[in-house]
Amino acid sequence: MKDVRALLLAAGLGTRLRPLTRSCPKCLITIGGRPLLEHWLCALYRNGITQALVNIHHHRTLVESFLARNQFQGWVYGVYEPQLLGTAGTLRQNREFFENEPVLLIHADNWCQCDFSEFLGFHSHQRPSGTSITMMTFRTSSPTACGIVEVDSKGVVQNFHEKIEDPPGNLANGAVYLLEPEVSAWIGERLFVKDFSTQVIPHFLGRIATWENQGIHRDIGMIHSLVAAQSDPQPVNCWDTADSWSRAFESHPVHHQLVGELD
């Protein structure tokens, strides 16, 4: 898929992972010895995404230091939010970066392994006509803790239920989306739109295609799910793990705390 640009939402506070996130942002929590954000950027790199924006808020200095590594220069850019803008607000604030191109919008605090080439290809060539968004979905064993979608025979979202007590199924929103430029334009024209799940998705019901991830998809917002992720098969790393940033991080008290908590 040509010209798609990525926005990785990585600025969250990670309150459910405290005390880990008191000294480390959630996006730098390690899985298989590598920061979560590095896993995401590796997936983009492998699939030819050459422009990516990462929003930053919590533990700004640590994230900016991570993004200053050589392998991210010229294609990954951090943007600091003194006050969090909301999942849709960040997209609106940075619309110029996307230059009227499709946007790969990623909630980068989840642990995801999938065939991104298939996801990108589905959006480009196979999504039903009349749709402007492709939502990655997955089957969850905890539907009350997820946003659950109802789809028609073509896989188009007809209804969406955000963390309700008795959801109608287990097909969950994976919080990874491909957006056509008209979606970004709609958000950009409406300053009151801050949240993607509660404001954008309801407006575009009937125009959201779905692609089901058959691989791994976890919300690692709780310690037990983060521990479970350590046992998942790990993808091959894209870059040298012995660079100066990695060596510094491994010697940092934050890293030792993470290792101690996850052992």
Q: Which ranges hold each PLM region?
A:
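Conserved donor NDP-sugar-binding/catalytic core segment of glycosyltransferases
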Residues: H123-I133
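Short beta-strand-to-loop element that shapes/binds the nucleotide-sugar donor at the catalytic cleft/hinge
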Residues: T134-I148
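Short, well-ordered beta-strand micro-motif
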Residues: T30, T137, E150, L178-E180, ...
